[in-house]
């Protein structure tokens, strides 16, 4: 008899889950203001009022208690801007985690450098500092650390390594908006913090991004790189003039945020701390409930003082269930929950199907881009056994968390139905 919903059985839940993205109060008014402002981008003519983009940049910098923020069109753009602002280019190597979204590797290749994936810590699933140390060569031009899912990486060790070798550390905070390490917001420890505001993120405008830095010179380089070689004007321009100055200091590309996106982000930012607190409370319930089923929750580094959840993540410890693979288990759990956002972990970077530089003509002749030869045993294990739950589910209530636990319990009890 078939019991699992994924095989045609009855699901344990039919109610819908919290909708994400959820607009902040006043979002429609803000969008209407942009719509009728005569200015839809930072590159549009000044209309006597500071752009939403510059207002968001100031607010995001203040949120992080840091001097500078440069908005960008996406998280990928923010990482590309940070890499190039740090001087990374042709022939350089950039250390990245072996477990992360594909953009960390493809963006490094996009600046004509070579991604070097290293293994992750089995508890945090973030960069293993010892593996980073072993991977450094004379060609290493940057280290990209990703604060993955809900964990903050070991920034004490990683900043020490970067400083000792005089290599820029770039924090990819696309999954860690608002997290704190030793009471400082993440993104403020390296040369740059980079952020994504893509649809699924806890701070979103559909697409978007930003870089933050405490270094005025790096910020100025970032401004040039994302606005076709232009920077913000130091003084208020006249009505009808540009709020961007053509300096001819550094050639750039167009990776700017639109005024619509910036207007949305200003409202969303005001809700972030409150939403993160709700996610933390529900994550604690999952830690207890799913932990009792033999799913080991991801932990954060000891210096973490405020954790945030892009996704709750945990490793299935039972060998009999774990060997089935999260690629089968996650959809089965989601089916029990009427399509809740339950996913398998990212695949390891040495087996990531989305990373295919050989399919792009621009990468011909660049040696070292094939990552299949790297050994990443911890990342490979995570790809087989780590399951994740998107933060939108964590905006529910205690009964929702109980449903998630019940769904896993049912799938685990009937896991033999999933064997091929």
Curated annotation (Swiss-Prot):
User: Reaction(s) catalyzed by this protein?
Assistant: 2-deoxy-L-scyllo-inosose + L-glutamine = 2-deoxy-scyllo-inosamine + 2-oxoglutaramate; 3-amino-2,3-dideoxy-scyllo-inosose + L-glutamine = 2-deoxystreptamine + 2-oxoglutaramate
Tell me which species this is from: Micromonospora echinospora
**GO BP terms:** antibiotic biosynthetic process; polysaccharide biosynthetic process
Renumbered to this chain, the signal peptide range is none
Supply the InterPro entries for this chain.
DegT/StrS_aminotransferase, PyrdxlP-dep_Trfase, PyrdxlP-dep_Trfase_major, PyrdxlP-dep_Trfase_small
List the CDD domains hit by this protein, alphabetically. AHBA_syn (cd00616)
Q: What is this protein called?
A: L-glutamine:2-deoxy-scyllo-inosose aminotransferase
* Modified sites of kind N6-(pyridoxal phosphate)lysine: 201
Give an example GO molecular function: transaminase activity
Pathway per its UniProt entry is: Metabolic intermediate biosynthesis; 2-deoxystreptamine biosynthesis; 2-deoxystreptamine from D-glucose 6-phosphate: step 2/4; Antibiotic biosynthesis; gentamicin biosynthesis
Q: Which family does it belong to?
A: Belongs to the DegT/DnrJ/EryC1 family. L-glutamine:2-deoxy-scyllo-inosose/scyllo-inosose aminotransferase subfamily.
Q: What class of enzyme is it?
A: transferase
What does it do?
Catalyzes the PLP-dependent transamination of 2-deoxy-scyllo-inosose (2-DOI) to form 2-deoxy-scyllo-inosamine (2-DOIA) using L-glutamine as the amino donor. Also catalyzes the transamination of 3-amino-2,3-dideoxy-scyllo-inosose (keto-2-DOIA) into 2-deoxystreptamine (2-DOS).
Keyword terms, alphabetized: Aminotransferase, Antibiotic biosynthesis, Pyridoxal phosphate, Transferase
Supply the EC number(s).
Answer: 2.6.1.100, 2.6.1.101
A Pfam cross-reference name: DegT_DnrJ_EryC1
Identify which cofactors the protein needs according to its UniProt entry.
Answer: pyridoxal 5'-phosphate
């Amino acid at each position: 008899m078939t019991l699992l919903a994924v095989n045609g059985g009855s699901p344990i839940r039919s109610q819908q889950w919290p909708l994400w993205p959820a607009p902040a109060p006043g979002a429609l008014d803000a969008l209407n203001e942009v719509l009728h402002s005569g200015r839809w981008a930072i590159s549009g003519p000044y209309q006597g009022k500071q752009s939403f983009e510059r207002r968001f940049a100031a607010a995001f910098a203040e949120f992080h208690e840091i001097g500078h923020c440069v908005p960008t069109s996406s998280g990928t753009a923010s990482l590309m801007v940070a890499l190039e602002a740090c001087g990374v280019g042709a022939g350089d190597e950039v250390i990245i985690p072996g477990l992360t979204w594909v953009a960390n590797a493809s963006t490094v290749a996009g600046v004509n450098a070579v991604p070097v994936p290293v293994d992750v810590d089995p508890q945090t699933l973030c960069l293993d500092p010892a593996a980073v140390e072993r991977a450094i060569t004379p060609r290493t031009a940057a280290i990209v650390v990703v604060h993955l899912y809900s964990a903050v990486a070991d920034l004490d060790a990683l900043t020490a390594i970067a400083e000792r070798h005089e290599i820029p550390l770039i924090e990819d905070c696309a999954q860690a908006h608002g997290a704190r390490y030793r009471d400082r917001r993440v993104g403020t420890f390296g040369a740059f913090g980079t952020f994504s505001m893509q649809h699924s993120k806890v701070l979103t405008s559909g697409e978007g991004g930003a870089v933050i830095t405490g270094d005025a010179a790096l910020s100025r380089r970032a401004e040039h790189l994302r606005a076709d070689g232009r920077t913000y004007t130091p003084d208020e321009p006249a009505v009808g003039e540009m709020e961007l100055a053509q300096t001819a200091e550094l050639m750039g590309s167009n990776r700017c945020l639109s005024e619509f996106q910036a207007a949305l982000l200003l409202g969303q930012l005001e809700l972030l701390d409150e939403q993160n607190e709700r996610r933390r409370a529900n994550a604690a319930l999952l830690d207890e409930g799913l932990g009792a089923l033999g799913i080991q929750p991801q932990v954060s580094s000891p210096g973490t003082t405020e954790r945030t959840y892009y996704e709750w993540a945990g490793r299935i410890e039972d060998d009999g269930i774990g060997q089935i693979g999260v690629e089968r288990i996650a959809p089965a759990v989601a089916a029990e929950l009427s399509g809740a956002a339950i996913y398998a972990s990212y695949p390891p970077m040495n087996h990531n199907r989305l990373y295919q530089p050989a399919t792009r003509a621009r990468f011909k002749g660049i040696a070292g881009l094939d990552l299949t030869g790297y050994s990443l045993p911890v990342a490979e294990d995570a790809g087989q056994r780590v399951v994740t739950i998107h933060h939108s589910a964590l905006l529910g209530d205690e009964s929702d968390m109980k449903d998630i636990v019940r769904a896993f319990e049912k799938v685990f009890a009937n896991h033999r139905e999933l064997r091929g």
